[in-house]
Amino acid sequence: MSKLRNLLPTIFGGKEAQNPTPVEGRLEKDAAPVDDNEPDNNNSGALALPSTAGTPTASSDLTESVLRELSDPNYNSMDVVHSANIPGTLSNVQTNNTMNVHSAQQQVVMNFSNANNLHFGSVYNFNQNLSACSSRKGSTSTAEESVASPDGKPRASATRKTVSIVAMMQSQEEPDVRLLDVVSTHLGEGWKQVMRDLGMSEGQIDQAIIDHQMHGNIREVIYQLLLQWIRSSADGVATVGRLTTLLWESQHRDCVQRMKLVWKALEKRKTNS
């Protein structure tokens, strides 16, 4: 409105319109300098910020520690975190704040000089006790090949082929029933294979088991099969030599040793008669 009056002073009339008083504009008033001594311009009620010029703060210390840890792997920034005195907190209050800085450029270099038998990784030991197994096998084989003497001591030459055993292997006589009784008594596991080697069929073995095991035992079955072998064989086939050789080669040597005692007794009787 004041501008319109200045442009058209004759319309509104009056001396005031012709000679208006100078009025400061808003821009001139806002841009005028402010006197600090005036009470309205005092900033005492505002928040006073402490001057930090030239004084390192905790944030600057942490930034510097991060840079130092990235450049130096041996530098520990946690020492700076614990030693930094952050404003507004008590120094004796323990905090759980932690900071871990990891750098992909860090490398661990280990130098070894004059090292012998250097090993990395786990070590696994397996004890198989090979010596114990071998000694146990050796003792088992020794026990099988030796027969105890009357005084209880093992006899090393128990399974040795003696002169009497060689004579039995060369004998062409028909086995006596007393020899058959010794064989049926002392022939153990593997007796079926012995019967097969003597020429007995599976049917004959099964029939003997059915006929005689119900009324006796395996001893009776073996005895009846030996009798059947002698009766069904041709002349000169069922001999003491054939039976002794078969039992010796089949590792039934203990049975042969017991046959020898009976055979020597029979031969002695023949000589005396």
From Swiss-Prot:
Residues 132-178 are annotated as: May be required for interaction with Fadd. Keywords: Immunity, Innate immunity, Ubl conjugation. This is Protein immune deficiency. Changing residue 30 to A: Loss of function. Abolishes caspase-mediated cleavage and ubiquitination. Blocks expression of Dpt in response to E.coli peptidoglycans (PGN). Residues 176-260 form the Death domain. GO terms for molecular function: death domain binding. PROSITE patterns: DEATH_DOMAIN (PS50017). One of its GO terms (biological process) is immune response. The keyword Cell division does not apply. Phosphorylated. Caspase-mediated cleavage is required for activation and function; upon immune stimulation, peptidoglycans (PGN) induce proteolytic cleavage by caspases such as Dredd leading to its ubiquitination. The lineage of its organism: Eukaryota, Metazoa, Ecdysozoa, Arthropoda, Hexapoda. A motif (IAP-binding motif) lies at residues 31-34. Disruption phenotype: RNAi-mediated knockdown in the fat body results in reduced expression of the antimicrobial peptide gene Dpt following infection with E.coli. Residues 143-177 are annotated as: Essential for ubiquitination and the induction of Dpt. GO terms for cellular component: cytosol. The record marks 30-31 as: Cleavage. Interacts with Fadd. Interacts with faf. Interacts with Rpt6. Interacts (via N-terminus) with Usp2 (via N-terminus). Interacts (via N-terminus) with scny (via C-terminus). The N-terminally cleaved form interacts (via IAP-Binding motif) with Diap2 (via the BIR2 and BIR3 domains); the interaction promotes ubiquitination by Diap2 and the E2 ligases Uev1A, ben and Ubc5. InterPro entries: DEATH-like_dom_sf, Death_dom. Residues 52-63, 134-144 have a biased composition (Polar residues). Essential for the imd/NF-kappa-B (Imd) humoral and epithelial immune response to Gram-negative bacteria. Functions as an adapter protein that transduces immunity signals from the activation of pathogen recognition receptors (PRRs) by bacterial infection to the Imd signaling pathway. Binding of diaminopimelic acid-type (DAP-type) bacterial peptidoglycans (PGN) causes multimerization or clustering of PGRP receptors which activate the Imd cascade probably by recruiting imd, Fadd and Dredd to the receptor complex. Changing residue 31 to V: In imd-1; immune response defective. Reduced survival and decreased induction of various antibacterial peptides after bacterial challenge. It comes from Drosophila melanogaster. Residues 1-63, 134-159 are annotated as: Disordered.
